[in-house]
Regions:
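N-terminal, charge-rich interaction modules
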Residues: 1-38, 103-127
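Hydrophobic beta-strand segments of well-ordered beta-sheets in folded domains
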Residues: 15-16, 53, 74-75
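Short, flexible beta-strand-to-coil junctions
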Residues: 19-24, 58-60, 78-82
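Short, intrinsically disordered low-complexity segments
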Residues: 36-71
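Intrinsic-disorder/low-complexity regions
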Residues: 62, 83, 124-125
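Short proline/glycine- and acidic-rich turn/helix-capping motifs at secondary-structure junctions
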Residues: 45-50, 79-95
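Short arginine-rich
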Residues: 71-79
Length: 127
């Protein structure tokens, strides 16, 4: 089985983590550059705790929805709430201790994935 703790660290205007197979890391890097982002560095590293959250500031909600569908995930978590991939509707919520504001909800530019969901499933399927 592939290592579920493999994650991608992205440095840029803001930093983020996403758990992903190497092929997705390359795809993400290309897409970020196409969107005009200029990450200083993208490196693979290991993050140990399975309950960690991975923050991907670069993804718009529409991109997060597309990604979740690509990996057959029923829903995904964003700063705005939990989005159902079948309907595209988001139930808004504020996770305990998670900071967010109206500007984040308006821009829909901050996707958050808990470990063990969409991308980790892809890693399991690659094994």
């Amino acid at each position: 089985m592939a290592e579920l703790s493999e994650v991608i660290k992205v440095y840029g205007k803001r930093f983020g983590f996403i758990s992903a197979p190497p092929s997705y890391m390359r795809k993400l890097e290309r897409e970020l550059k196409d969107l005009g982002y200029k990450p200083e560095k993208i490196e693979a590293f290991y993050k140990g705790e399975p309950e960690d959250w991975f923050y991907v500031p670069y993804l718009k909600m529409s991109d997060g929805l597309k990604l979740a569908k690509e990996y057959n995930q029923e829903n995904f978590v964003t700063e705005a709430g939990v989005t159902d991939t079948s309907t595209g509707k988001t139930k808004r919520f504020a996770p305990s201790g998670h900071k967010f504001g109206a500007d984040a909800l308006a821009s829909e530019s901050y996707a958050v994935y808990p470990k063990g969901t969409a991308i980790s499933v892809a890693l399991e399927n690659d094994a």
